[in-house]
């Protein structure tokens, strides 16, 4: 009985001091170290570096829309190798990890979708800066249609 309680006590002690990270993509310093890094903007991308990376193959920006799987977004894969997390785009939309990327477009690391909440309030500035809202919406629909019918470009090494 005494041996069992000592073994249990030792096991509890080892578990309390164990700080191993069992997730394959843990940041340097462990799971909680990501909270210590200040938030930074994601890498610039696209024509003239006017956009921001939203995922390893997604580049979006004001006045240019989104590039998904194209050469303009190829540099975004480098974001995966940086040690600190980044924050892209405007406010949260769609899923919990989605962000407003352009007027009417919500993106997360996996892809983009049309989201009407991204055309309200903060994103209304994008529309007023570019063209009239009805023309901007037509252009957005054409761009999303092209993206959905175009196979992703592959970067050859």
Swiss-Prot record:
Subcellular location: Secreted
GO molecular function: neurohypophyseal hormone activity
The protein's name in its UniProt record: Isotocin-neurophysin IT 1
Major localisation: secreted
Organism: Oncorhynchus keta (Chum salmon)
Cross-referenced Gene3D superfamilies: Neurohypophysial hormone domain
Protein purpose: Isotocin causes contraction of smooth muscles.
Disulfide bonds: 21-26, 42-86, 45-59, 53-76, 60-66, 93-106, 100-118, 107-112
Modification after translation, per record: Seven disulfide bonds are present in neurophysin.
SUPFAM superfamilies xref list: Neurophysin II (SSF49606)
Similarity comment text for this entry: Belongs to the vasopressin/oxytocin family.
Keywords carried by this UniProt record: Amidation, Cleavage on pair of basic residues, Disulfide bond, Hormone, Secreted, Signal
PANTHER family membership: ISOTOCIN, NEUROPHYSIN
Presence of the UniProt keyword Signal in the record: yes
Record's keyword annotation contains Endoplasmic reticulum: no
Entry superkingdom: Eukaryota
Residues that bear Glycine amide: 29
GO cellular component, one term: secretory granule
Leader peptide range in chain numbering: 1-20
């Amino acid at each position: 009985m005494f041996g069992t309680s000592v073994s249990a006590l030792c096991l509890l002690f080892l578990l309390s001091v164990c700080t191993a990270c069992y997730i394959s993509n843990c940041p340097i310093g462990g799971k909680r170290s990501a909270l210590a890094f200040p938030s930074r903007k994601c890498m610039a991308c696209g024509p003239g570096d006017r956009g921001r990376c939203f995922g390893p193959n997604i580049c979006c920006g004001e006045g240019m829309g989104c590039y998904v799987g194209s050469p303009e977004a190829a540099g975004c894969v480098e974001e995966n190798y940086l040690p600190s997390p980044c924050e892209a785009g405007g406010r949260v939309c769609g899923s919990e990890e989605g962000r407003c990327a352009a007027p009417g477009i919500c993106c997360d690391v996996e892809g983009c979708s049309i989201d009407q909440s991204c055309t309200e309030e903060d994103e209304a500035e994008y529309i007023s800066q570019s063209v009239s809202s009805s023309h901007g919406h037509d252009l957005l629909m054409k761009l999303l249609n092209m993206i959905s019918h175009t196979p992703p470009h592959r970067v050859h090494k």
